[in-house]
């Protein structure tokens, strides 16, 4: 694994490149307030299968710059960061994917830059059915980050000093709890005020193969959202996870699904141009 960085619109963005020996790239993105640590196990497993996986810390997350201007944290701005990463890597087309926020960013990138996207892996996307639960969860967080800053500065400072664990997904949660209230407030505000997902018409126009991962009993990532998305995308397949944490704690089944999807996606296509 190699760590690199690049500048986009004056901001430094950091990524990790897991080169499994392939020139064909999967960019896999983290969820809201989390970072690349969340997906290290997935990247290791897929790289072991021969796939190249790049994990990007989106602006405000992980090791990337963290300004306090909410306008820089719109989901469409995040999609532009992904395209800038591909430009930096010299990659014409890649498979995009991620968890929650990462899934939505990948969808927006596919809608706005279809020429750069070879396929999609969409884990727990946040769509229309999630709006009430997301509002109940994120608005109090936004208010707490704004009005409870003195206390949150203390708790985030303390959390940043806690030693990290051998569990990368847990470390990602700890990193999220270490964010300053100013940055957290800016991220939440920016994500909430901008477009969250492409329109239904745009989704129906995304023709690349897609794998949609979903589970039940989750208000912020409801199964109905994932099922509807899989029906709206012309070339999508829905895979049901046993739990929200399966891909992080018991990943063997789902990483095989991901690996098979990538292998099929990049497999040479038969030449249909030849005549009898």
Stretches with model-predicted labels:
Residues 107, 111-112, 118-147:
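Flexible "cap/lid" loop of the alpha/beta hydrolase fold
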Residues 235-276:
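Catalytic active-site module of serine/aspartate enzymes centered on a nucleophile-bearing elbow/loop
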Residues 219-225:
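Conserved alpha/beta-hydrolase "acid-adjacent" motif
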Residues 55-97:
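Active-site loop/oxyanion-hole signature of alpha/beta-hydrolase fold enzymes
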Residues 206, 212-214:
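Short beta-strand/loop motif that positions the catalytic acidic residue
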Residues 98-102, 106:
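Gly/Ala-rich beta-loop-alpha elbow adjacent to hydrolase catalytic centers
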Residues 11-65:
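Conserved HGGG/HGGXW glycine-rich cap/lid loop of the alpha/beta-hydrolase fold
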Residues 172-201:
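Hydrophobic, aromatic-rich cap/lid helix
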């Amino acid at each position: 694994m190699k760590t690199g960085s690049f500048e986009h619109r004056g901001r430094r963005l950091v990524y990790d490149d897991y080169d499994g020996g392939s020139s064909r790239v999967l960019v896999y993105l983290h969820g809201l307030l989390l970072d690349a640590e969340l997906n290290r196990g997935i990247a290791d497993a897929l790289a072991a299968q021969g796939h190249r996986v790049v994990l990007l810390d989106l602006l405000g997350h992980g090791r990337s710059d963290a300004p306090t201007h909410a306008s820089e944290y719109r989901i469409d701005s995040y999609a532009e960061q992904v395209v800038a990463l591909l430009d930096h890597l010299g990659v014409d087309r890649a498979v995009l994917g991620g968890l929650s926020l990462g899934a939505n960013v990948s969808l927006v990138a596919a809608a706005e830059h279809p020429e750069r996207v070879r396929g999609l892996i969409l884990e727990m996307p946040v769509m229309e059915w999630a709006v009430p639960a997301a509002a109940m969860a994120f608005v109090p967080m936004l208010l707490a980050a704004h009005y409870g800053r003195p206390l949150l500065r203390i708790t985030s400072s303390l959390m940043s000093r806690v030693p990290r664990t051998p569990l990368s997904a847990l470390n990602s949660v700890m990193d999220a709890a270490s964010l300053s209230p100013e940055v957290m407030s800016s991220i939440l505000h920016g994500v909430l005020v901008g477009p969250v997902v492409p329109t239904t018409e745009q989704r129906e126009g995304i023709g690349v193969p897609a794998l949609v991962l979903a589970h039940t009993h989750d208000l912020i990532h409801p199964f109905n959202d994932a099922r509807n998305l899989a029906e709206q995308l012309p070339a999508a397949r829905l895979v049901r996870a046993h739990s929200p944490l399966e891909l992080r704690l018991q990943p063997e089944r789902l990483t095989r699904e991901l690996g098979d999807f990538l292998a099929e996606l990049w497999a040479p296509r038969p030449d249909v141009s030849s005549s009898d």
